[in-house]
Regions:
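Sec-dependent bacterial lipoprotein signal peptides
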Residues: 1-15
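Mixed-charge, low-complexity intrinsically disordered regions
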Residues: 15-154, 165-174
Length: 174
């Protein structure tokens, strides 16, 4: 009986889908948006499933931050091209279900001999997980809007509707 319960617990603990990456656009798509020089055009946040002890996805839906891609409007160059800056930030994480949900456990053993007592306390702390940001990867580029008013960054299509020296009007399409 105990062996079958143990086997069931181990089988259920290994449950969970394989780890997946999720991209979330922070702006609304399919709607006209306006920004200023230096303003954010789009931001795509990336997360992955929190891994469990077996390397599968956390059954409680925990996520780990994996960074983002951001596009900013930088203005118009001397030759009339629209200038943009794309920044990619990635993270490295050692977080798992054990580090996020695990707690500390203490065990105390005491022994009474006559009128004296002695004992030991043993404490186990769950491993600590950490997520650190890697240095940003930033690239600036210019687009001739007379040739093309559309381009794609991080899987999101940017369609430029109007541009001035100080503003950009556009639509994002997923």
């Amino acid at each position: 009986m105990r062996i079958s319960i143990l086997a069931l617990v181990v089988a259920l603990a290994g449950c969970g889908a394989t780890l997946q990456t999720y991209d979330r656009l922070t702006q609304e798509s399919d709607r006209e948006i306006m920004t200023h020089v230096g303003g954010q055009v789009l931001k795509v946040k990336r997360t992955t499933d929190l891994p469990n002890a077996f390397g599968n996805a956390d059954i409680f839906g925990g996520k780990v931050d994996r960074g983002f891609t951001e596009l900013r409007f930088q203005g118009i160059a001397q030759d009339g091209r629209a200038v943009f800056r794309v920044t990619e930030i990635e993270t490295q994480s050692t977080e798992t279900t054990m580090s996020r949900y695990g707690g500390s456990k203490s065990k105390m053993d005491a022994q009474l001999i006559g009128n004296r007592m002695s004992g030991t306390v043993t404490t186990y702390d769950a491993p600590r997980g950490s997520t650190e940001m890697l240095p940003p990867n930033t690239t600036q580029f210019a687009i001739d809007l007379n040739k093309s008013k559309e381009f794609t960054v991080a899987g999101v299509k940017v369609r430029v509707l109007a541009v001035t020296e100080t503003s950009l009007t556009y639509v994002l399409q997923r």
